[in-house]
A protein has these predicted regions:
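Parallel, heptad-repeat alpha-helical coiled-coil signal-transduction segments
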Residues: 1-13, 27-34, 41-69, 75-150
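Generic hydrophobic, aliphatic-rich segments that mediate packing or membrane embedding
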Residues: 21, 39-42
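Membrane-proximal coiled-coil signaling linkers
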Residues: 15-25
Length: 152
């Protein structure tokens, strides 16, 4: 009889210890899940910011395009002016070169930003999947906690 009582006490002690540990694991899983959701929110903010920067780059590209057209028009007018328009033609050519450099830089920047946007979107997708898995783990742990609590 003493042996049965001893075994029962040991089982109760182990169940209590298991209950305590499973509660701790559950809290850590909830904490991890919350941190995952915070990360997803931050990544969404980065994504929004990248889209806004893309809009600014588009405006810069449009300005470069318009400047290039103005430079071409100025070159035509300089040619019409003949010898008197040579100095103006040089300035128009420099403006054209500057517009082309601006357009190239805007395009390169837009490509880099789009690459970042794509990577952030992929990261958000992975983080969402991870968060869903963590949520399932938390739910499963809560079920285990209930079972162990009823035993302890």
């Amino acid at each position: 009889m003493n042996e049965i009582a001893k075994e029962t006490n040991e089982n109760a002690t182990q169940a209590t210890t298991g209950n305590k540990l499973i509660h701790e694991v559950g809290e850590e899983a909830k904490n991890g899940n919350e941190q995952m959701h915070n990360m997803i929110e931050a990544m969404n903010d980065i994504n929004t910011s990248s889209h806004n920067i893309s809009k600014v780059i588009k405006v810069i590209d449009d300005i470069a395009f318009q400047t290039n057209i103005l430079a071409l028009n100025a070159t035509v007018e300089a040619a019409r002016a003949g010898a008197h328009g040579k100095g103006f033609a040089v300035v128009a050519e420099e403006v054209k070169n500057l517009a082309e450099k601006s357009a190239a830089a805007a395009n390169e920047t837009a490509e880099m930003i789009q690459s970042s946007i794509d990577k952030v979107e992929e990261g958000v997708k992975i983080a969402d999947e991870t968060a869903a898995s963590l949520t399932k783990i938390v739910e499963s742990l809560e079920n285990v906690v209930e079972i162990i609590s009823s035993i302890a």
